[in-house]
Every structure is written in structure tokens, then in C-alpha cells.
A protein has these predicted regions:
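Short aromatic-glycine-(Arg/Gly/Cys) micro-motifs in beta-strand/loop hairpins
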Residues: 1-19
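Internal catalytic or translocation cores that form aromatic/hydrophobic pockets or channels
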Residues: 22
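Short, mixed-charge low-complexity intrinsically disordered segments
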Residues: 39-74
Length: 74
């Protein structure tokens, strides 16, 4: 099992939100800092960490590190 650190931006399209390119980081701090830097460029952004076991297909509950703007529930 490993822990991944993800930043997911969201952009406004018509009346909804479209997920942008997912960014992955080595540490939770790096992910949170990048999300904070990108926050003013997107309708919403979230940074989170999650434990994953790709071989077994198990994914843990996301732990939000930073959230700003309009973000759908994880």
C-alpha cells in the first residue's frame, strides 16, 4: 500500500464543472502548496492524499489537504 498526493483542478464549463488535469506529488505538503498557488486560476481546486493498493484494487478514503472554490464531493 502506498499513499498518493493529488491535486485536482475544476473549471467552469457552461453551467457545470469540468475536471482538469490531475497532478500527482511526492508529498502532501507539495500537493497542498501547488493547489494553493493554482487556486485563483480555476473555479475550484482540491488537494488530497489517499492510500492505494493498486494490485488489490483497494482505495482508501481521500484526506483533503486544501480546498478552494467550487469542488464536487470526493
Amino acid at each position: 500500500m502506498e499513499t498518493i498526493h493529488i491535486v485536482q483542478p475544476f473549471d467552469r464549463v457552461n453551467k457545470g464543472l469540468k475536471p482538469g488535469q490531475v497532478l500527482q506529488f511526492k508529498t502532501a505538503d507539495e500537493a497542498a502548496r501547488r493547489a494553493e498557488l493554482l487556486a485563483d486560476k480555476h473555479a475550484g481546486i482540491v488537494a488530497y492524499s489517499m492510500d492505494v493498493d493498486e494490485e488489490g484494487g483497494d482505495y482508501g478514503t481521500p484526506r483533503v489537504l486544501f480546498e478552494s472554490g467550487d469542488v464536487p464531493e470526493l
